[in-house]
C-alpha cells in the first residue's frame, strides 16, 4: 500500500535523525477549497454514522470465549515501552492484570531511534520471554529479532501495529481497517460538533506513527462523503514535540490559517495545555482529538476543549493481553468486523459527560470482572 510505504519511510528517516531535526515545521496538504454556494456538511448522515459509537449499552468484549485452560504459572511477559505519554498510561493499566493473574511483567524501554530499539530487542530475545506486548512499535525496526522470536515460538500481541500478519505475527485487533473506521468517526464527530455549519477543517497528524495515515485516509473519505465541498488541511506534528511544543505548533498553524473553522487531532495528548494557549493568542477555534489521555478529558469536562473521541485504553490493553494469553495457550479465536471493534472501544465525549470519566473513558464498566471469568482467575 502506497500510504503505508510512505509512513514507513518517514518513520525510518525519523529514527536516524536527532530530536532537534524532528522539531522542524510540519508539512501541510489540503483538499480543494469549496466553491461558492456549495452545499455544506450532511449533519443527519454524520449523526447516523456516529450512532454506534455513542451507544452507552450493549458494548461487549471482542472475544468472549473462556481460555482453554489456566494461565501457566510463572508466565513471563515483556511490555515494549516506546517512551510516549500514552505508553506510560498503558503500562499502568497492565498492573492490575499482574496482580490478578500472577504473571511476571517486565517493562522494556525501547527508545525511538534505531540503535536503542535494536539494543532493547536483542535483550528481549536473550531473556526468553513467554510472550511480548507491543504497542505501536513498527516491526521494521526489529526485523532480525522478530525472526528469532518467531523461530523460538514467542507470541507477540500488538496494539496499533499495522503490518502484524505480513510479518508473521498474530493479527492486531486495531489494524488498518480499525484505524480507518476511527478516522471516519473523527470526521463525523467534527461535522456533528460544528452542527454542520463549518466547511474548513484541519487535521493534525503524527507522521511517525504508522497507524496515523490510515486514520487520515478514513477521515478524508468520510468527510468527502459528508461534505464533498469542504476544505481539509492535513498538518504534520512531529512525534518528538508531543508533550512539549506540539500545542504551540497548533497555535501557530491556526494563526497562519484564520479561515479554519475546526481542528481535529489524531494524537490528543499533543493538545494538552492548548486551550490556554489559544485563549492567550485570541484564537476561538474549537476542536477535538482522539487517543486522549486524562488531562484531555479534564479539558473537555471544564469546557476549554470542545470534545474528544477517546479510546478506552483499559479495554484496549486488557484485550491485547487476552489475545496474548490465547496465543500462549494456542487457543483459536476470531475478531469481529473492524467497525464493531472500533466503536466498541470509543465514544464521543463533551462537556456534558466527560466528567464521568476522570481516569479515562470506560466502555464496559465491569470489564475486569468479565476478563477474570474468561481467564479462570479472581474468584
Task: List each model region and its residues.
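Beta-alpha junction/loop-to-helix N-cap segments that form part of ligand/metal-binding clefts
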Residues: 111-164, 172-177, 268-275
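Hydrophobic alpha-helical segments within soluble ligand-binding/sensing domains
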Residues: 62-64, 173-201, 213-214, 246-247, ...
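Bacterial lipoprotein signal-peptidase II cleavage site
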Residues: 24-36
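Hinge/cleft segment of the Venus flytrap/periplasmic-binding protein
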Residues: 36-74, 317-379
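An alpha-beta-alpha
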Residues: 76-79, 94-96, 184-227, 232-236, ...
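Flexible loop/hinge segments that line or gate small-molecule binding clefts
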Residues: 36, 140-181, 200, 293-301, ...
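Extracytoplasmic "Venus flytrap"
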Residues: 34-66, 70-93, 106-118, 123, ...
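Hydrophobic alpha-helical
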Residues: 132-151, 219, 239-299
Amino acid at each position: 500500500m502506497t500510504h503505508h510505504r510512505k509512513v514507513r519511510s518517514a518513520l525510518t528517516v525519523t529514527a536516524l535523525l536527532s530530536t532537534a531535526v524532528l522539531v522542524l515545521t510540519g508539512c501541510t496538504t489540503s483538499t480543494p477549497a469549496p466553491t461558492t454556494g456549495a452545499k455544506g456538511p450532511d449533519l443527519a448522515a454524520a449523526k447516523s454514522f456516529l450512532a454506534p459509537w455513542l451507544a452507552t449499552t450493549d458494548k461487549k468484549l471482542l472475544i468472549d470465549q473462556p481460555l482453554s485452560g489456566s494461565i501457566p504459572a510463572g508466565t513471563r511477559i515483556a511490555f515494549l515501552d516506546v517512551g510516549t505519554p500514552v505508553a506510560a498510561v498503558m503500562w499502568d493499566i497492565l498492573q492490575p492484570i499482574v496482580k490478578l493473574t500472577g504473571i511476571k511483567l517486565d517493562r522494556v524501554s525501547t527508545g525511538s531511534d534505531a540503535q536503542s530499539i535494536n539494543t532493547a530487542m536483542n535483550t528481549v530475545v536473550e531473556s526468553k520471554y513467554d510472550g511480548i506486548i507491543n504497542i505501536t512499535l513498527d516491526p521494521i525496526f526489529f526485523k532480525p529479532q522478530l525472526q528469532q522470536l518467531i523461530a523460538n515460538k514467542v507470541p507477540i500481541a500488538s496494539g496499533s501495529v499495522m503490518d502484524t500478519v505480513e510479518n508473521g505475527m498474530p493479527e492486531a485487533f486495531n489494524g488498518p481497517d480499525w484505524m480507518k473506521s476511527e478516522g471516519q468517526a473523527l470526521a463525523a464527530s467534527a461535522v456533528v460538533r460544528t452542527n454542520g455549519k463549518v466547511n474548513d477543517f484541519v487535521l493534525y497528524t503524527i507522521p511517525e506513527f504508522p497507524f496515523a495515515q490510515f486514520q487520515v485516509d478514513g477521515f478524508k473519505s468520510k468527510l468527502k462523503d459528508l461534505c464533498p465541498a469542504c476544505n481539509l488541511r492535513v498538518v504534520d506534528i512531529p512525534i518528538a514535540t508531543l508533550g512539549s511544543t506540539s500545542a504551540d505548533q497548533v497555535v501557530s498553524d491556526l494563526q497562519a490559517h484564520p479561515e479554519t473553522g475546526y481542528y481535529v487531532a489524531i494524537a490528543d495528548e499533543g493538545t494538552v495545555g492548548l486551550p490556554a494557549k489559544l485563549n492567550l493568542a485570541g484564537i476561538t477555534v474549537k476542536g477535538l482529538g482522539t487517543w486522549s489521555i486524562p488531562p484531555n478529558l479534564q479539558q473537555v469536562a471544564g469546557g476549554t476543549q470542545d470534545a474528544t473521541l477517546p479510546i478506552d485504553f483499559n479495554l484496549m490493553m486488557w484485550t491485547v493481553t487476552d489475545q496474548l494469553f490465547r496465543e500462549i495457550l494456542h487457543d483459536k479465536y476470531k475478531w469481529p468486523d473492524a467497525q464493531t471493534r472500533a466503536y466498541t472501544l470509543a465514544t464521543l465525549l463533551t462537556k456534558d459527560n466527560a466528567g464521568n470519566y476522570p481516569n479515562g473513558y470506560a466502555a464496559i464498566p465491569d470489564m475486569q470482572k468479565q476478563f477474570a471469568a474468561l481467564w479462570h482467575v479472581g474468584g
